[in-house]
Amino acid sequence: MTTSLREDRSSSIGWLIAAGVAGGMLAARAALRARRLYDLRGKVVLITGGSRGLGLALARAFAHEGARIAVCARDAREIERARDDLASRGIEAFGTPCDLTERAGVERLVREVRARYGRIDVLVNNAGLIQVGPMETMTPADYEESLRIHFWAPLYTMLAVLPEMRRRRSGRIVNISSVGGKISMAHLLPYCSGKFALTGLSEGMRAALLQDNVVVTTVCPGLLRTGSPRNAFFKGRHRAEYSWFSISDSLPILSMGAARAARQIVTACKRGDAELVIPTMAKVWVTVNALFPGLMTDLLGSLERSLPQPGGIGSARERGARSGSALSPSPLTLLGDSAAVRHNEI
């Protein structure tokens, strides 16, 4: 046998072994998913930030699977509107106001949900806050606020429900991070800092809790059509910032509908997936960033130059709903504006 033939044969065997290993890994993954499949019928699901946006869409999606729903938010009026929305769909939900950045308030929330339903089977940490503007307009207080909401609040809720879940050796936790918790963006620096912290916390919690059969899923959404830009905060040239952000949030190529996203998140929770990145465009960004981090950083730096520069109201901030312009609302934001009505963002 010539050297060339021996090399060809060795190469073929190598490819066969690699294919066999890959096939075995896929089969093992499918078997593990099947073993972990979680029946949501009758389960109690607590959703933070559940009064509007993605949180409200998740409440509807979990209820569709037969779960019993509890939601919390800061604004009691928003909670009442959310309960009315769910009731109109035949869904009974418990709702209560809570400041998640206060640990005592979180513990009170968990006691109230247990008093109503007897237990908590699934925790969804969804509450969040978006701050948009150039780096120069952001203050230390903005970073502290983001960490309180995106890191400390989820930590408090997890610590409050974990003793019960670990005793039962059963439970699910879904942490809604962001593609901004994988790739940092210049005009979202406090937000991304908080979401990076949540991603790290969530991944570490999964590793720590698998032995107790408490399964943690980290969700990293990109742009979702929930209408949430109306309730985000904008700094600097706030009208221009709101325009680019709300238009991006409305474009079908870049964004995903909230109901579809919620269904995928519920499926990931049931299967016990480690991570879910949605939509497809966000998966592409995360993959490129993992393979070529320098390239992605340079691309984002180039994008920064096309975004609004410092000025306007400076480090003061204004809600998106008060930052309209000729570009937003407009036909370019039609999908996002319609979503805001459906998901209680108005």
Question: Which functions belong to the PLM regions below?
Answer:
Residues 76-77, 97-108, 140:
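The beta1-alpha1 cofactor-binding region of Rossmann-like NAD(H)/NADP(H)-dependent oxidoreductases
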Residues 178:
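Residue(s) in the substrate-gating loop at a strand-loop-helix junction
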Residues 65-81:
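Conserved glycine-rich Rossmann-like NAD(P)H-binding loop of the short-chain dehydrogenase/reductase
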Residues 211-282, 287-291, 297-307:
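SDR active-site lid
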Residues 134-135, 142-144:
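Substrate-binding pocket helix/loop in short-chain dehydrogenase/reductase
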Residues 158, 194:
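Active-site helix of classical SDR
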Residues 44, 51-52:
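Conserved glycine-rich cofactor-binding loop
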